[in-house]
């Protein structure tokens, strides 16, 4: 049984790294240019348990969900141009389903993430698509609720923007390509996004 699990893991890892769809950057994006540019800000993440998504904060730092990272010690990261690197978790004690990954084991953490306080128009989820084995912009949707973070620190944005299993850790953006938040969960109809402002609580 152990050998079967090991073989399955190797096959999944091989497909994740060497798929013909690896170089998604070569595919023409037909969306708004500002949203198309976000494709290079998203990565695929391979853990011992799943394939998920992550969002690049700077050249060394990636944010994803805590439920993706769990207690694993390292991860395989696939960039939009097909490059593969290892990443390692950085500890934090802020109570949110967010996790930081570093590409060089150094705590090269910015003091603050600059973000827009206004959300323009509809939003899209940009994440790693397991089926295509490449980054993808999903069908746009509207925000249906947005809690006051000052009163409800764990409040989430609820949206009709489409996503699929394995998109956890991907980023939601508005029509200007501004980060709105990090995808956390959903049921295929209504999805939950962790507001981007909460990332700054982790960076502190």
Segments predicted by a language model, with ranges:
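Boundary at the C-terminal end of the N-terminal hydrophobic targeting segment
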Residues: 19-24
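Bacterial N-terminal signal peptides that target proteins for export
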Residues: 1-9
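Active-site region of chymotrypsin-like
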Residues: 27, 34-49, 104-111, 135-204
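A cytosolic small-molecule/anion-sensing beta-strand core signal
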Residues: 57-58, 175
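Bacterial N-terminal signal peptides
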Residues: 9-18
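Short secondary-structure capping/turn segments at boundaries of alpha-helices and beta-strands
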Residues: 30-31, 87
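Conserved active-site neighborhood of the chymotrypsin/trypsin-like protease fold
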Residues: 42, 50-51, 58-137, 153-154, ...
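Conserved hydrophobic positions within beta-strands
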Residues: 56, 87-89, 143, 179
């Amino acid at each position: 049984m152990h050998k079967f699990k090991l073989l399955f893991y190797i096959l999944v890892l091989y497909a994740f790294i060497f798929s013909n769809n690896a170089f998604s950057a070569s595919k023409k994006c037909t969306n708004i240019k500002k949203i198309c540019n976000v494709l290079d800000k998203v990565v695929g993440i391979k853990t011992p348990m799943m394939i998920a998504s992550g969002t690049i904060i700077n050249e060394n730092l990636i944010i994803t969900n805590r439920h993706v990272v769990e207690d694993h010690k390292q991860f395989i990261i696939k960039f939009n141009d097909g490059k593969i690197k290892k990443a390692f978790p950085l500890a934090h004690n802020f109570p949110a389903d967010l996790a930081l990954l570093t590409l060089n084991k150094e705590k090269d953490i910015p003091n603050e993430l600059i973000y827009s306080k206004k959300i323009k128009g509809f939003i899209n989820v940009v994440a790693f698509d397991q089926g295509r084995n490449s980054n993808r912009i999903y069908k746009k949707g509207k925000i249906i609720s947005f809690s006051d973070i000052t009163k409800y620190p764990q409040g989430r944005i609820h949206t009709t923007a489409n996503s699929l299993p394995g998109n956890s850790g991907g980023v939601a953006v508005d029509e200007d390509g501004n980060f709105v938040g990090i995808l956390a969960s959903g049921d295929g109809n209504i999805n939950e996004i962790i507001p981007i402002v909460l990332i700054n609580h982790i960076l502190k």
